[in-house]
């Protein structure tokens, strides 16, 4: 694939981010798991908030077409304060020294072209630049493609967390990578 450019998304990118997330939601449905399949998550409000807070990043090809997205936050995630297991680093959302990855997706037309790897590499670069000691992420236990990617990128499964939003299947495998 030609070069992938990654940049912080702005308000005008919201429709493109939403499209990529719908593509990701459809790909997850094809796996036969419930992640992102109940209710409206992720929705317009989630994307608009990510963009407004500077947490949303967009991967594009040389024509400017949206290929993938990732939400990267340095604010801590209270959901991660209660883990059935143990994090590799000892920090809570109140004094977060970790970056959190959420809402990652790739347009199905761009699958297997290194987009997610590029997004994760940029997230790691930004996390290091921000002085984070680690990165955390979570995914559905049945999302084997994402679990495999996290492990290939050096993340360690640390236990399970429970989502705080309304979800009939709230258990997620929690991962951390020490930087």
Residue ranges and their predicted role:
Residues 127-139:
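Conserved GNAT acetyl-CoA-binding A-motif
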Residues 111, 137-147, 166:
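Conserved beta-strand-loop-alpha-helix junction that forms the acyl-donor binding cleft
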Residues 117, 129, 141-159:
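Conserved active-site alpha-helix within GNAT-family acetyltransferase domains
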Residues 77, 138-139, 151-172:
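Conserved catalytic-core motifs of GNAT/GCN5-like acyltransferases
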Residues 5-19:
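A short beta-loop-alpha structural element at the N-terminal edge
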Residues 106, 112-125, 148-152:
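Conserved acetyl-CoA-binding loop-helix of GNAT-fold acetyltransferases
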Residues 18, 25-46:
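Conserved GNAT-fold acetyl-CoA-binding loop/helix
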Residues 71-105, 166:
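Conserved acyl-donor/pantetheine-binding loop and adjacent beta-alpha core of acyl/acetyltransferases
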């Amino acid at each position: 694939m030609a070069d992938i450019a990654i940049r912080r998304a702005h308000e005008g990118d919201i429709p493109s981010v939403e499209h990529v997330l719908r593509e990701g939601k459809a790909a997850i449905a094809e796996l036969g798991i419930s992640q992102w399949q109940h209710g409206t998550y992720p929705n317009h409000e989630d994307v608009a908030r990510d963009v407004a807070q500077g947490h949303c990043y967009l991967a594009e090809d040389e024509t400017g077409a949206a290929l993938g997205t990732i939400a990267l936050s340095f604010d801590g995630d209270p959901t991660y304060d209660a883990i059935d297991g143990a994090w590799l680093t000892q920090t809570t959302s109140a004094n977060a020294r970790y970056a959190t990855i959420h809402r990652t997706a790739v347009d199905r037309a761009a699958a297997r072209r290194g987009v997610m790897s590029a997004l994760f590499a940029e997230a790691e670069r930004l996390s290091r630049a921000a002085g984070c000691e680690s990165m955390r992420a979570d995914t559905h236990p049945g999302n084997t493609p994402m679990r495999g990617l996290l492990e290939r990128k050096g993340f360690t499964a640390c236990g399970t967390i429970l989502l705080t939003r309304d979800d009939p299947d709230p258990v997620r495998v929690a991962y951390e990578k020490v930087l």
